[in-house]
Amino acid sequence: KPYVDTTFTDPYGTAVGVINPTEKFKVVIEAHADEISWFVNYITNEGVIYLKRNGGVDHQIAPAKRVLIHGKKGVVKAVFGWPAIHTRMSNGDQKEQNPKVENLFLDCGARTKKEVEALGIHVGSVVTYEEGFDELAHDYYIGRAFDNRIGGYMIAEVARLLKENNKKLPYALYVVNAVQEEIGLRGAEMIARRIKPDIAI
């Protein structure tokens, strides 16, 4: 807010900061605010949690990953499981299975469906991978949802640097952090129809 002239959000939740809102020529710089995730789809009587994908999450990397289930009572830790290796390889005629959405599940430590529900977990709860940030060799960094977080940081930095360096633009600049990118660019599409930019990056 301190770096733009005005702000607004749309009904989807996309956040917009505008510099020079009265100028007719409109430029959008956009990042996205959402991240890949999973949804709780089914809870068995034994407390095993099955999921559906939300966005472009890769199920092949899921086995043994730690996750956070965002439930009604807060965050619950869990871990991805899938059939143990000795059960996957017990049939000599059959090739070892690959991870599939259908054979992946979450274990949150609960022993029954009631125990899962008592933790605040319900069908529709969002599941994200555990937080984590690290530095690799040669100044490379890794972390959860880095694509959108770095993108959001970059567009905010543009606004900050323009303000702090007292740069005047001959056009309206819309700094847009859109939602629903991971499920089909919906937020960007809706806000573009509202702003009607001449240029979008």
PLM feature spans:
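N-terminal hydrophobic/helix-forming segments and targeting peptides
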Residues: 1-201
